[in-house]
UniProtKB/Swiss-Prot annotation:
It catalyses: L-histidinol phosphate + 2-oxoglutarate = 3-(imidazol-4-yl)-2-oxopropyl phosphate + L-glutamate. The lineage of its organism: Bacteria, Bacillati, Bacillota, Bacilli, Bacillales. The keyword Transferase applies. This is Histidinol-phosphate aminotransferase. It comes from Staphylococcus saprophyticus subsp. saprophyticus (strain ATCC 15305 / DSM 20229 / NCIMB 8711 / NCTC 7292 / S-41). GO terms for biological process: L-histidine biosynthetic process. Keywords: Amino-acid biosynthesis, Aminotransferase, Histidine biosynthesis, Pyridoxal phosphate, Transferase. The modification N6-(pyridoxal phosphate)lysine is found at K221. It is an enzyme of class 2 (transferase). One of its GO terms (molecular function) is pyridoxal phosphate binding. Its cofactor is pyridoxal 5'-phosphate. InterPro entries: Aminotrans_II_pyridoxalP_BS, Aminotransferase_I/II_large, HisP_aminotrans, HistidinolP_aminotransfase, PyrdxlP-dep_Trfase, PyrdxlP-dep_Trfase_major, PyrdxlP-dep_Trfase_small. Its EC number is 2.6.1.9. Homodimer.
Length: 351
């Protein structure tokens, strides 16, 4: 066993509704609003596509996910040779880390961001520098100051999970202009389809200028396919060729690929999800306590409080399972009736 693994722990997704009911003696229904899932689910076309291909379960998928790769290349107008798929972004992050990092290498990222950047770097015996957030947002200047000759990867999450904040197009361009061109800057845009800010980065456009700007996207969030595990990286061809060596041969399942194809095709449904989410998100910021919320461009709201466990339990008492952090609670935006219950709790809670 690698010694460095001893300093890590397995991912803990939080207690299930069943376990929470037992622990807290809750009798009524519990709603899972802890994992930033799209509770509306995927497009109806996805279910039709899955049903249409159920007779293929005995076959391995086509290696490399060629159908969805071609569809994404047309949708985003990019060369398919610049795309690599994984079983969710977790696997994509693992493949990149495994392909690039050697013992003693360094990654630079932020504190309080998606934990798999750190986790996979430690597995590869790399050193991790985590720059503190500035009011919930990535400190790009602080990250830049930590980049040196040992730095092999820079991880950015935009919008950031768990805070929901984002950096602008101009901020990202300015950052990329100052990062040495041989160091990959990987921008994780798992929640990009929820973003409505006009100055949100067009990272695809910036890739035309900066070959070291890599982009991660997923079907798990706005597309509603978290259970199907499919995400991808867009990067320079040379990098994709190297990462592809690490990719397991049949990593994305047949049904996952068909589901993603159907979801991508139904952009009208995706737009309706974005609109509903933005409408419900805005209602949280109409509360008088909204100065305790980080501005969000995602399908969740981070509530800052020095009483996170008390707030978590108060929300649990109205049937809403959220995610507790040391300095606050992350609330997934759910259906209107669930959101209304949570806003009522927040309105009465002393943050």
């Amino acid at each position: 066993m690698k010694k460095q693994i001893e300093q890590l722990s397995a991912y803990e997704p939080g207690l299930s509704p069943r376990a929470l009911k037992e622990n807290y003696g809750i009798k009524g229904e519990l709603h899972k609003l802890a994992s930033n899932e799209n509770l509306y689910g995927p497009s109806p076309k996805v279910k039709e596509a899955i049903q249409a291909h159920l007779d293929e379960l005995q076959y391995y998928p086509e290696t490399g996910s060629p159908l969805i790769k071609e569809a994404i290349s047309k949708h985003l107008n990019i060369d398919p040779a610049r795309i690599l798929f994984g079983a969710g972004l977790d696997e994509v992050i693992l493949m990149i880390s495994r392909a690039v990092l050697t013992p003693g290498d360094k990654i630079v990222t932020s504190e309080m961001t998606f934990g798999q950047y750190y986790h996979n770097a430690i597995v590869e015996s790399a050193n991790v520098v985590q720059v503190p957030l500035q009011n919930g947002e990535f400190d790009l200047d602080g990250i830049l100051s930590e980049i040196d000759n040992d730095t092999k990867l820079v991880w950015l999450c935009n919008p950031n999970n768990p805070t929901g904040r984002y950096f602008t197009h101009d901020a990202l361009r300015n950052f990329l202009e100052r990062v040495p061109s041989h160091i990959p800057v990987i921008v994780d845009e798992a929640y990009v389809e929820f973003a409505t800010a006009k100055d949100f980065p067009d990272t695809l456009a910036l890739q035309q200028e900066f070959e070291n700007a890599f982009l991660l996207r997923t079907f798990s969030k706005a597309y509603g396919l978290a259970g199907m595990r499919i995400g991808y990286v867009i990067a320079a061809k040379e990098a994709i060729e190297k990462y592809n060596i690490i990719r397991p041969p049949f990593n994305v399942g047949r049904l996952s690929e068909y589901a993603a194809l159907a979801a991508l095709e139904d952009q009208e449904y995706l737009a309706s999800i974005r609109e509903r989410n933005a409408e419900e998100r805005e209602k949280f910021f109409e509360l008088s306590q909204s100065d305790h919320f980080y501005p969000s461009q995602t399908n969740f709201v981070f509530v800052k409080t020095d009483k996170p466990h008390e707030l978590y339990e108060a929300l649990l008492n109205v049937g809403c399972i959220t995610r507790e952090f040391p300095n606050g609670v992350r609330i997934t935006i759910g259906f209107p009736e669930q959101n209304a219950k949570m806003r009522e709790v927040l309105a009465q809670f002393t943050l």
